[in-house]
């Protein structure tokens, strides 16, 4: 995410102009833009004049800059688009409804009261644009998966299966060649790569890849895991391989925090989960780290019930981490009620 303007008052009210550059940035914006915000962006809208009313099928869409008072936000991951719907307050057809389609590369400005976690999201996305992406490759005999580490979770890029038949050596070389081709195609030149899997297949692949593209292989990190697929990718994250590449990786941090939370739950230790337990812990000033699922935060924020709790945590020197429900730790947190806390002391 590229930030081009910050104009905020001491109470965090004001305008930030920015440009999303990736699908991750659009996901962040889903939780930054909320009902009541004023969002400006270039958009296309049919000109509303007398001639057009007589011949509506002839009306042409013009590119105009509109300011929309937000009523609804939808993230369409598979079309790489964020849809911001609301009432036009500035520009042509004020008083009518319009939907802004925000894609990567769209310049927009957001005027609102900025909550602390929303500013942290902007800062995180801006910093992430300067860090390398990570590509995960999980290989076992006959099967391989390639995935991207995203802010919202792991996105499977491709699954490769070795053909069966005679000439096992040749088929294995074709299998490795396909993996290497897919990996090369997935890279733009700035990513880091982790190759993982059980047994020696990954090592054999690395030898093959080295013979074909030694420059690419030189920067690859190799990790042992017990499986491939999504569970293998999760194992790579838990082992800290991604953390060693991106120290501030959102996903690695959430995995580590969820492991700590589950250990405390198993020990009946310094932990609270579910809204009632967490509220009680906040009242006692016991919360060290508040864990909130993004969907829970959005829903509670719409009802106006959660910001006071967050402020109380911050006043007692606690911190908050928002989990993505697109990713396994966030899904686990959702199953625990969408909110939990690691405590300073047992309540």
From Swiss-Prot:
The main enzyme category here is hydrolase
Q: Could you tell me where this protein is found in the cell?
A: Cytoplasm
Q: One MF term from GO for this chain?
A: metal ion binding
Q: Which domain of life is it from?
A: Archaea
Q: What keywords are assigned to this protein?
A: Cytoplasm, Endonuclease, Hydrolase, Metal-binding, Nuclease
Known cofactor(s):
a divalent metal cation
Kindly list the biological process annotations in GO that this record carries.
nonfunctional rRNA decay; nuclear-transcribed mRNA catabolic process, no-go decay; nuclear-transcribed mRNA catabolic process, non-stop decay; ribosome disassembly; RNA surveillance
Q: What is its EC number?
A: 3.1.-.-
Matching entries from InterPro entries are given as: eFR1_2_sf, eRF1_1_Pelota, eRF1_2, eRF1_3, Pelota/DOM34_N, Pelota_arc, Ribosomal_eL30-like_sf, Transl-rel_pelota
Matching Pfam families, A to Z?
Answer: eRF1_1 (PF03463), eRF1_2 (PF03464), eRF1_3 (PF03465)
Q: Which GO terms describe its cellular component?
A: cytoplasm
Domain comment, as recorded: The N-terminal domain has the RNA-binding Sm fold. It harbors the endoribonuclease activity.
Which NCBIfam families does this entry report, sorted A to Z? Answer: pelota
**Subunit field text:** Monomer.
UniProt lists the family membership as follows:
Belongs to the eukaryotic release factor 1 family. Pelota subfamily.
The protein's job, in short, is: May function in recognizing stalled ribosomes, interact with stem-loop structures in stalled mRNA molecules, and effect endonucleolytic cleavage of the mRNA. May play a role in the release non-functional ribosomes and degradation of damaged mRNAs. Has endoribonuclease activity.
- The protein, known as: Protein pelota homolog
